């Protein structure tokens, strides 16, 4: 028997990115967990079904957070720029996740709060720790949210307690994938997660491409967030024409490996065109870009180019998992960007 759920209220949604569709006092019909249709008048065939009537309340689609890396230290250390912030705040916190009990407590809070937010889908970072990342996936699966979760890879330029051996990092990723397959999650999917180019050697990226091909999983990472970071990538990868080219060199930049890249604040013309050609998704994280003084991503340009752009809370660089707050920051950043261009 089909599982039918009917909501009544003022329904707002979008068929295209340029216009809202509004159905006042309409009916949203879900069949077996998927939207079957939106109706101004309920079809006769559904007349006997129960209706959840929300009166004059708005009914909107659940939101997708394209970049949610950490949580417990959200909104702290905002007097620092990216690289110093990672060393001072992020890495010491992530090292604690070696302790599965600590991870369990932290991830339980994260999953609970995410469920009570406007987000229904998210791309989430774990840490390098395989068991703790599985704990994160367990909590998110129980929440009912639809998520992609990654075990992070780092084999250079990171503290001793967070630096994996190159072979170890690749092998742990394979073992993690086997664990995920064994658990048979319904709503929680794996996503390959090299933290960013400075923390991953060429050898590791080459191995991770083999993992990606073997399991046909998507990729998430960071791109052109900070000017110092970009200069560092130039030193580490002299063969790369631009930051994104370093990922693309190993087949981890869209095309046959669906990819989400966070930030993209300083993407060059060549990088933008490669993202467009390869179908790379941009995770726009306006609050953390402000908090860490990274800059303002040219999102209007990306949309005009036809790139796929979504919002990221980027907790803990952002202060909250609330994507309504991210929307407000995106609007302010967009206004500033346009005014800077005019002047």
Where do the PLM segments sit?
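N-terminal metal-binding scaffold of metallo-dependent hydrolase/deaminase domains
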Residues: 1-46, 57-59
């Amino acid at each position: 028997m089909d599982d039918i759920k009917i909501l009544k209220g003022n329904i707002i949604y979008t068929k295209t990115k340029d216009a809202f569709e509004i159905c006042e006092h309409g009916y949203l019909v879900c069949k077996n967990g998927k939207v079957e249709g939106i109706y101004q008048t309920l079809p006769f065939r559904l007349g006997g079904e129960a209706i959840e009537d929300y009166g004059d309340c708005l009914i909107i689609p659940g939101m997708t957070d394209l970049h949610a890396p950490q949580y417990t230290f959200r909104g702290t250390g905002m007097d620092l720029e990216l690289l110093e912030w990672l060393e001072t705040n992020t890495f010491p916190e992530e090292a604690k996740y070696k302790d599965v009990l600590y991870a369990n407590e932290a991830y339980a809070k994260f999953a609970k709060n995410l469920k009570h937010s406007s987000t229904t889908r998210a791309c989430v970072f774990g840490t390098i720790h395989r068991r703790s990342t599985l704990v994160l996936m367990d909590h998110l699966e129980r929440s009912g949210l639809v998520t992609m979760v990654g075990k992070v890879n780092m084999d250079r330029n990171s503290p001793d307690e967070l630096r994996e051996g190159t072979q170890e990092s690749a092998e742990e990723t394979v073992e993690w994938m086997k664990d995920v397959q064994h658990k048979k999650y319904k709503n929680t999917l794996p996503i390959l997660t090299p933290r960013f180019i400075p923390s991953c050697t060429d050898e590791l990226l080459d191995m991770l491409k083999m993992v990606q091909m073997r399991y046909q999983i998507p990729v998430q990472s960071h791109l052109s967030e900070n000017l110092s970071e970009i200069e560092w990538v130039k030193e580490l990868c002299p063969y790369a024409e631009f930051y994104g080219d370093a990922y693309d060199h190993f087949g981890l930049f869209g095309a046959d490996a669906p990819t989400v890249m966070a930030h993209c604040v300083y993407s060059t013309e060549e990088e933008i065109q490669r993202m467009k050609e390869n179908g790379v998704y941009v995770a726009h994280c306006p609050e953390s870009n402000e908090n860490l003084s990274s800059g303002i991503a040219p999102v209007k340009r990306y949309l005009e180019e036809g790139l796929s752009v979504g919002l990221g809370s980027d907790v803990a660089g952002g202060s909250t998992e609330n994507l309504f707050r991210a929307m407000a920051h995106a609007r302010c950043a967009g206004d500033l960007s346009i005014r800077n261009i005019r002047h």
